[in-house]
Every structure is written in structure tokens, then in C-alpha cells.
Amino acid sequence: MSDTSNTPDNDGGKTAGGKPAAARTEAKAPPKSARRRSRELALQGLYQWLLNRNDIGAIQAHLHDAQGFNKADREHFDALLNGAVREEARLTAAFEPFLDRKVEELSPVERAALLVGSYELVHCLDIPYKVVINEAVELTKTFGGVEGYKYVNGVLDKLAAQVRAAEVAARR
């Protein structure tokens, strides 16, 4: 009299958690949104521009031809890249009071992420400030140094409290 339905060799087609054996496959990461892809490409363009101040039109054209650009929100990408370059001085002046070092001492990735996040906080009022900050943090985690995302988070959180005071107050 043996019951083989739940032995280690025969788990009845289920995992230890009771899930069907077919559910044992690795979970795939959700596909990136078009806006996230546009932010990634804008960050890459700003990085190139910050390093060598090449013509932004040439950088933009190169990124339009980049693999995966067809999955990006082209309008948002163009607005981020061109807007951040056009308003670099104004955006930097907005977040600079919240830095604990000179702007020139920031890594190019941190600086580019701050420019993208600052531009969105100031100009993309349809995007909640928490989403703007989270997206900049994710960019920094993906492309930046080990702890850079914490710094970007802190700076943009303080900037959001200043430029979107009513929205921040309503959510806290």
C-alpha cells in the first residue's frame, strides 16, 4: 500500500509551492515602456553631449538610428534631449542648491539623470513627480555607479518639493 502521489520523485505535477510544474519557468521582466526607452536614449545622448559637447543634432540623429529606437516614444525623447540641452544652465541652477559637491564633480551619468529628471519635473506635469524620480533612479541604477542612484533620488526629491510643492504636499 504505497501512495506515490507526493513523493520527491513524483510530486503530482506540482512544485513545492503547489504551483503546476509548467509554472516553473523563469519570470520574464516586463517589456520596457516607450517612455522608459526614450529616457534611456535621452540619457545616453546627454552623456555623449556632456563628455564632448558634440553637435546635439548629430547625437540625436545617431540615436534615432540606434537599435531599439523604434520602441521609444520619439516625441518624448526629442523633448527630453533637446530640452535638457537647451535648458542645461537653468536646470542645473535648479538642482545645484541640493548638491553636496560641485556640478563638475558629478559623474556624467548622474548629471545626465539629473538633467532628465529635472526637465521632466519642470515641463512634464502630466507625469507624477514620484514617477519622474523613480525613472531617474532606475536610469542611474542601470547606467551609473553603485550608489549614484541614492544621490539622484535625494536631489530630485528636494527639487520636486520646490518645483511641484502642491503635488508633493498633497501626496505626503
From Swiss-Prot:
* One Gene Ontology CC term in the entry: cytosol
Q: Record's SUPFAM superfamilies?
A: NusB-like
Keyword RNA-binding among UniProt keywords: yes
- Where are the membrane-spanning stretches? none
Protein name in UniProt: Transcription antitermination protein NusB
| Gene Ontology biological process | DNA-templated transcription termination; transcription antitermination
GO MF, one example: RNA binding
Family classification: Belongs to the NusB family.
Which stretches does the entry tag as region Disordered?
Answer: 1-37
Gene giving rise to this polypeptide: nusB
